[in-house]
């Protein structure tokens, strides 16, 4: 709905995620509890 959210890492940190960073075909969405692979990058705030 908002176009962004947070991904929880295995060590408990929350990482900001914007929908434009989701690399998939079709509708870019993630479900709560879904396992994902990701790289953390520094960005503008």
From Swiss-Prot:
GO MF annotations for this entry? DNA binding
Spell out the InterPro entries in the cross-references: Cold_shock_CspA, Cold_shock_domain, CSD, CSD_CS, CSP_DNA-bd, NA-bd_OB-fold
Which keywords annotate this record? Answer: Activator, Cytoplasm, DNA-binding, Stress response, Transcription, Transcription regulation
Residue ranges of domain CSD in the record: 1-45
A GO cellular component annotation in the UniProt record: cytoplasm
The UniProt record describes its induction as: In response to low temperature.
Q: Where in the cell is it found?
A: Cytoplasm
Q: Name one Pfam family in it.
A: CSD
Fill in the subunit field for this protein: Homodimer.
Q: Specify the protein name.
A: Major cold shock protein
The record lists the organism as Streptococcus pyogenes
């Amino acid at each position: 709905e908002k176009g962004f959210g947070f991904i929880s890492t295995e060590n408990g940190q929350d990482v900001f995620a914007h929908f434009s960073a989701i690399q998939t075909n079709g509708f870019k969405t993630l479900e709560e509890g879904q396992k994902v692979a990701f790289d953390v990058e520094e960005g503008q705030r």
